[in-house]
Amino acid sequence: MNRHFLILFSFLLLSVPTFAESALPVVEIKADRTMIYPQRMELTGEETLMDVLQMVPELMIAGYEDVIDNYNLRIDNCPMNGDTRLILSQMKAKDIAKIQVCDNTGVAKGTIGMGRVLDINMKMPERLNGFVEGQGDFGKEVAGIGAVNALYGSKATDLYANASYRHQNGNEEYLTLHMTNRFDERNKLLTYFTQQYLDHPAGTSRKVMGRARYFHTFNDQGTELLIVGGYQYASDPALSNKLPLYIVELNTPLLTKQLSMMLGVEGDFQMTKQKDTDRSWDVFNNDIYLQFTYALPQWKLTVGNRVMFYNYKLMDAGISQKHADTRDNANACVIYVPDSRNQIQLGYYRKYYNPSYQPLFMNAITLSDEEWAITKGQLVERTINQMKLAYAYSKQRLTVQTEASYYAIEDGENFTELGASVYWKTMVSTNRPTGLTLAGGSNLYTAKSGTYASFRFAPTAYLPHEWQIGMQVVYYTRNSPRRETTGVPVYGCLSVNKQFGKKWNLGVDWHDMFDAIRSEAKVNRHAANIRLQYRF
C-alpha cells in the first residue's frame, strides 16, 4: 500500500513540470510583437523554423527561395546576413527558445515604414551538436549547396556557428558566428560576427558586420542595462559604405512591479561613397525612445514613442549640402488576457515612410514614388497610421490567430489587411512519434484600387519508420502582386524526408511544382532539391 502510494506520489511530482509547461500559451501577444515559444509545443524533434512560422497570420510565401520576403531575419536582434531559405529549413524548433514576430517595433527597434523583424532566440544544448549538409537543386538551372551548423552550450558559454556556400550562376558564401558569455548571474556579453560574399555575373559584393551586446542586471527586481556597439562595411559595384552604431538602453520596474519602463538612445553613422563619380554622403541618425507598460493580471497597457534626428550631408565637387529632419514613431496598445488560452489586442501605431538616400543623392531612376524626393532635394516623410485588432487562442497542440489592420497613409492609398491562421497537431507519443500536423492561413488586402487574397495549406505527416511527408500549397487570387509577377496562381512544394538512425537524413523537395504545368508561367522555376545531412 505504502509502496503504491510512493509510486503515485513520485509520478505526480514528475508530471508537474509537464502540466505547467502545457498550461503556458504557445503564442503570447505583446504590444509591438507576437511571441512564439516552440518549447511549449509538442515536438517530434524534426520540426523546422519554417514549420513553426506557418502559424503566423501575416506570413507571405513568395516562393521556395523567398518565404519571408517581408521580414528581416535576426538572431538575438542582430541581422543575420545568411542564406535565408537554408536557415529556415535547417534550424530546428527544438533549438529555439522563442520566436519574436515583430510587426510594429518602430519604438523598440526603430523599424521604418512597413518594415518587420523576425528575431530568433536560441535554446542551446548542453553539449556540442550540429550537422553537415549537401544539396543539389536540379531544374532549368542547377545549383550546388553546402552548409555546416554547430551549437554548443555550457554554464558560462554558448556558441552558434553557421556557414554555407551556394554555386548557381555565381558563388555565394555566408558565415555567422554568435557567442554568449555569462560572467556571473548579473553580467552577460553577446558577440556577433557575420560575413557574406556574393560573386555574380553582374558584379561582386561583400558585407562584414560585427556587434557586441553587454547586459548588466542591477538588482533582483530586474533593472537591466544594455550597451551595444557595432560596425558594418558593405561594398558592391556601385557603392561602398561604413556604418558604426551604438545603443544604450535601460529596462526597469518603475515605482511598482506592475509598471515597467524602457528608455534608450541609439545612433548610427552611415558613410557612403559612389564609386563611378566619387560622390559621397554621410547620414547621422540619433534616436531617443521611451516606452511604458502597465501590467495587471488580465490587462496590459503600453504607450511609447521614438524620436529620430536625421542629419545628412552630400559632398560633391567641393560643394556640401546639409539637411536635418526629425521623425517619430509612436504606439498605444491594450491587451486583454481573460485566461491562459485567450488574448485580445487593440493597438494604434504611428510610423512613416522615409524616401531612400540613393535616389536623393545619386539622381537614380527608381521604380517607386520615391522619385519625387529628387526634385525636393531633401527627405520628406509620409506618415502611416495603423489601427490593429488581434486575437489569439493557443495551447500545446492548437493555435488560432486572427488579425485586422487599417492603414491610413499620407499622400497614398489607404488599405485594410486581414489575416488568419490555424496550427493543429495530433501525435502518438512514443519513442518514434507518428502523427499529423495541419497548418493553414489566409490574407486579404483591400483598397479602392482593388482587392486580392492568398490562401495557404501546409499539412505534414509523421509516419512509421521515421518517414516524413509534407506539402505547402498557396493560392493567389487575381491582382495579387505575387501572381502578377510570376504568372502562376498557385505555389506548391512537396517534401519527403527519411531519417536513417540518429546520424543521417535524406530529403527531397519538389518545389514551384505548378510552374511545370501552367503555360502562363513567366519563369519556369520548378525543380527537385535533393539533400543529405549528417548530424553530430
Label each region the model flagged.
Residues M80-N104:
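Short acidic/polar hinge/loop motifs at secondary-structure boundaries
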Residues C333, A390, K522-F536:
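Outer-membrane beta-barrel "beta-signal"
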Residues Q168-I247, Q270-T272, W281, Y353, ...:
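Flexible loop and strand-edge segments within Gram-negative outer membrane beta-barrel domains
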Residues Q135-K140, S154, Y165-N169, F193-D199, ...:
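Transmembrane beta-strands of outer-membrane beta-barrel pores
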Residues T399-V474:
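Gram-negative outer-membrane beta-barrel transporters
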Residues K207, K322-H323, S340-N342, Y352-Y406, ...:
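Outer-membrane beta-barrel signature, preferentially recognizing the C-terminal barrel domain
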